[in-house]
Amino acid sequence: MKISIVGAGNAGCFTALYYSWYGRKKDLEVELIHDPNIAPQEVGQATLLGAPELLGTGFNYYDNHIHATPKTGILYEGFGKVNEKFIHAFPTNTLAMHFCPCELQKFALESGRFNVVEDNVDPKDVDADYVFDCRGTPKDFTGYTPLKSPVNAAILGKPKWDSKELWSRHVATPDGWAFVIPMDESSPSHNGAVGYLYNNKITKTEDAKKNFEQIFDVEVKRERTFKSYLHMNPIDDRVILQGNRLFFLEPM
């Protein structure tokens, strides 16, 4: 059986690593096709439990070429009516991780665990038994249903403090909430390790930026807007939508 993945963002890389690792003792060919001219995002990312074991195909925290940091849970600040802070702590015998998408991509493509093809293709034209479409956010939202979300914009910043905690932070703000991803200072994603989320139909970008800088000691780097959506037909014959090609909803 042959499985092809189109796209080398987070979803594409993790899908390829998953099938190459768990299918290594089976008659399974794994191929990742990507356009090298499309760069992955530089925003700091965080996984749930389980993802680090996929990187165990060649990753460890001693030879940490992707500058990942351990994630032991999620700290919520300012959301509780009784407690100012509360933590969703992971079991002590497990770990998730914080990572940079472009460094993860380089690691995955050079891992030697699957075939890599540089090309810009339509998933329906790929010769494989099953094809995962991981090409990221669509340009055409035909077939997608909007999802309700209180936020639709983000301001990204570089922390000016030592952000080496072993957990992600989600902080309630006057305009929505903010995430703080503890990234290695040498990682490109350190420039987008803090994100201030808000609704630009309610809060002006200038006001959100002012509040961001008042609450956090950051160097503002860039702004972006986004849609929240879900495709209603995730499987079309042998093509399966994955990652942001399937849906997007800003996590908390």
Question: Residue locations for each model-derived region?
Answer:
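Short beta-strand to alpha-helix junction loop
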Residues: 46, 89-109, 200-203
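A short, Lys/Arg-enriched amphipathic alpha-helix followed by its capping loop at the start of a domain
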Residues: 15-28, 54, 111
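Beta1/beta-strand and adjacent pyrophosphate-binding region of the FAD-binding site
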Residues: 1-11
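Predominantly flavin-linked oxidoreductase catalytic cores and closely associated redox partners
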Residues: 110-216, 247
